[in-house]
Design a protein with these regions (language model features):
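Extended, polar beta-sheet/loop recognition surfaces of beta-rich domains
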Residues: 149-179
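Short, surface-exposed loop/turn segments at beta-strand-coil junctions that are enriched for proline
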Residues: 127-133
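Short beta-strands and strand-coil junctions in structured, solvent-facing domains, enriched
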Residues: 78, 134, 147-149, 167
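N-terminal, post-signal-peptide metal-ligating segments of extracellular/periplasmic oxidoreductases
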Residues: 17-116, 121-123, 170, 176, ...
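Bacterial N-terminal signal peptides
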Residues: 5-15
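Beta-strand-rich extracellular modules
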Residues: 73-75, 142-146
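Short, conserved beta-strand segments of beta-strand-rich sandwich/propeller modules, principally
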Residues: 136-138
């Protein structure tokens, strides 16, 4: 059976949660340099992002023309019992900054050669262009062959490029930000 993933950050209607699901009403936010860690969450039984002692990915907030400085530590186990697209998963990992018009070169958004094996660290310095429109973007793992499993586990988060959104918002009642991030992996 195929695993099904769902990641969405938007205004949505959410059905009641089962006893095992949880709603986190205050997502952590970061505006400056920070460390994000890939870990195995034994309580949840899958891989996750860890930030500030919790397995909840932070919302990255940035202004156009600024730099996202991020240290990404791969603390995933060296061995995995799961199968990936190319065989046994090796828990290699990296990050992709989806939707941002940024350089595909190191140390920005190089998803092809910038990889970390378990125990390794990657340093990202992502320059958000000054012409970037305000809006909602996202980051997620992107190692080809393994990203589906990692993304299905919830190894993704939101990026908010801040700025003057008045030209984008017509109704004054819509000027209040509401963000819902949903991520789900079926067994």
């Amino acid at each position: 059976m195929r695993a099904i993933a769902f990641f969405l950050c938007a205004i949505v209607v959410v059905s009641p949660l089962s006893a095992q699901q949880q709603v986190i009403t205050d997502l952590p936010e970061v505006r400056g340099p920070f460390t994000l860690t890939a870990v195995y969450d034994s309580a949840a039984g899958h891989n996750a992002f860890a930030y500030a002692g919790k397995t909840v990915p932070p919302v990255i907030r940035v202004l156009p023309g600024r730099v996202i400085k991020l240290r990404y530590a791969n603390n995933l186990p060296r061995k995995s019992d799961e199968e990936c697209a190319t065989g046994r998963c090796g828990n290699v990992s990296n990050l992709h900054f989806h939707g941002l018009h940024v350089s595909p070169e190191r140390p920005q958004d190089d998803v092809l050669t910038m990889m970390s094996m378990p125990g390794e660290i990657l340093e990202y310095k992502v320059v958000v262009p000054s012409y970037s429109p305000p809006g909602l973007y996202w980051y997620h793992t992107h190692p080809h062959g393994e990203s589906a499993r990692q993304d299905l586990d919830g190894m993704s988060g939101a990026i908010v490029v801040e700025g003057d959104a008045s030209r984008l918002v017509v109704e004054s009642s819509m000027k209040h930000e509401r963000m819902v991030c949903v991520s789900k992996r079926s067994p």
